[in-house]
Amino acid sequence: MATLNSNPEILLRKRRNAERTRVEKQEAARRRAEAEVRQRRARQHKFVRAEALVASTLATEREKTRIQRVSKRAAKQRAGHVTGGEWLVRVRAAADGGLEREKTAYDGRATLLFVVRVRGPAAAKIPRKAHRVLTLLRLAEVNTGVFVRLTAEVFPLLQVVAPYVVVGRPSLASIRALVQKRARVVHQRAGEAAPVEMVLNDNGVVEERLGDEGVICVEDIIHEIATMGEAFAKCNFFLLPFKLGREVSGFSALSRLQKLKQREEASQTRPVSNAAAAPLVEVDVDELIGRLN
């Protein structure tokens, strides 16, 4: 005797719709992958003007020369042949609409910085040494940020990648806003086959991963980062780099105008210097986080 299908009609309809949705998503992903391959091939065969090649070559050579000067001075400083030369320039908006600059010597004390990756000099390719430093800082993508403890050893590294980053001293409110809104981690839950990237909104995950360090909740992570406590490195590397929003996006005429204004402001705030002892420029990172968070 044949067995009747006892599944309700609604359940069968849901299964059918779920299967159709899954197939449609797979087809859309396949079309996106094919489109990316076509775009990649088109970029490889794209016509490049001679002026663009010359500009890119000159800009890249200037960057290589700058990094060689910075690295050579750092080596002399480690050997004791050169002293001093580590300067910080704090740039703030003035009341009259201009910029105030305050230049101070770095005293070697540990200082908490928030470092944001930005686009480098126009037309220049990133030299290999600068790329290695950016990878070490986990700043492989533009508009990502990490917390860094500035020390005498880290200062030369930030000088190497100065055109590609924006640095500043974050306040406790900015640290809390970043961690609560943008914190992501890689974690493997019980029963999962592999670790997955997830938003950090569970204190149980924090206690499981950092409980041995005395860190059991998100507020403990914020405290360790703000005070640069003993578990600062563990908490910092537990968090993935913060993915920030774009201040200007799109390709409309207004967006292009805003990008030009943004580039002009960046050139005034953070002028690129090819000097070996160029100071490290600090900006109002709290205001920057408020715009991008």
From Swiss-Prot:
This is Ribosome biogenesis protein RLP7. Belongs to the universal ribosomal protein uL30 family. GO terms for biological process: maturation of LSU-rRNA from tricistronic rRNA transcript (SSU-rRNA, 5.8S rRNA, LSU-rRNA). Pfam families: Ribosomal_L30. Keywords: Nucleus, Ribosome biogenesis, RNA-binding. Signal peptide: none annotated. One of its GO terms (cellular component) is cytosolic large ribosomal subunit. GO terms for molecular function: RNA binding; structural constituent of ribosome.
